[in-house]
């Protein structure tokens, strides 16, 4: 039996979908434990591309049980669209189950997200406007609607009526915009209740029993550590916790049940939305990496900001989640660059610092301290053994290990499952 947690160790978009899909072959259960449809996981199977936002990436493996845990906020409209899209492409989705305790994204959450972001003006966060933040806000305020509430034919209408009355007052009096019609929302979400009810499970019991029976369980995270509500670049963060600890909270299992934490990192760094980014490349090279890496958001389509690998943030993420090893993705994107830079620390007020600062004001004044590495010209997209990588690529990877103090278990050199170099079997 082995339990592995997948964590993004940068600002999200690290390639967690591909790695989850790759590791799902040896797992029996795949659990999404936080976030919502603000996630965008791209998986390629036999040249067919699948883009998933809510459903675990393991769904593309027949016979694997896929679970949406209580830490995830669910937009049933998006869930239905994903299920329908997968079914149209011949993917069986009857192996999906949803936690009774997951909170539901309502139409007023999506509208609140958009209105509040607009009100911020120049201080905008860069939200996806999917209603994620307002749903977590209602959860913390104890007025949210859970799956178990949605499928309760007596309770749901009462909860919805109270919430719509409250939200409409805010929309109309504070934001001078129209609210929602109770009957319309009720009818729509009663339909979603019928869809969700057969999938509903006590996920904590299900996952606990699976671990007890010796099954391999893979916990799939969304976003990245630097977007964590507590440990990220606040306030430019998400509303959940993309860290290893959240796998326990978001699925209902104890921390002693987790065996390994795998951090996913690109061979460079990207970020979507606002906020500081010390190694960002605002030049033609950044555009070249964006083009070669196809760096556009799966969820929003927004171009990602690109920069050099930052060992400071990855070492920070490793400490926060207790990472056992790393999976390096998109190493192939760096092929052809004459020089590759790696950030080993920051220069702040004339001194070199190695730890990630909490203050964004301080972070904005930090200058990256770079180490230069000669690049490689070889096409590495079909390399399957570490020994066959160019020497310069191996030296670059070895330095990443030294600076982050975390070993490498997997290296991805392309989007396909076959384009993966295995250094260690994570389920042994």
From Swiss-Prot:
Top class in the EC scheme: ligase
InterPro entries in UniProt: Adenylosuccin_syn_GTP-bd, Adenylosuccin_syn_Lys_AS, Adenylosuccinate_synth_dom1, Adenylosuccinate_synth_dom2, Adenylosuccinate_synth_dom3, Adenylosuccinate_synthetase, P-loop_NTPase
UniProt: IMP binding residues: 13-16, 38-41, 128, 142, 223, 238, 302
Keyword GTP-binding found: yes
Binding residues for substrate: 298-304
Classification via SUPFAM superfamilies: P-loop containing nucleoside triphosphate hydrolases
Pathway assigned in UniProt: Purine metabolism; AMP biosynthesis via de novo pathway; AMP from IMP: step 1/2
Cofactor note: Binds 1 Mg(2+) ion per subunit.
Binding site for Mg(2+): 13, 40
Record: active site: 13 (proton acceptor), 41 (proton donor)
Essential cofactor(s): Mg(2+)
GTP-binding keyword on record: yes
Listed GO biological process terms: 'de novo' AMP biosynthetic process; IMP metabolic process
Residues holding GTP: 12-18, 40-42, 304, 330-332, 412-414
Compartments, record wording: Cytoplasm
Any one of the GO CC terms: cytoplasm
Keywords: Cytoplasm, GTP-binding, Ligase, Magnesium, Metal-binding, Nucleotide-binding, Purine biosynthesis
Catalysed reactions, as listed in the record: IMP + L-aspartate + GTP = N(6)-(1,2-dicarboxyethyl)-AMP + GDP + phosphate + 2 H(+)
Cited Pfam families: Adenylsucc_synt (PF00709)
Single Gene Ontology MF annotation: GTP binding
Protein family per UniProt: Belongs to the adenylosuccinate synthetase family.
Role noted for this protein: Plays an important role in the de novo pathway of purine nucleotide biosynthesis. Catalyzes the first committed step in the biosynthesis of AMP from IMP.
The protein's name in its UniProt record: Adenylosuccinate synthetase
Organism of origin: Desulforamulus reducens (strain ATCC BAA-1160 / DSM 100696 / MI-1)
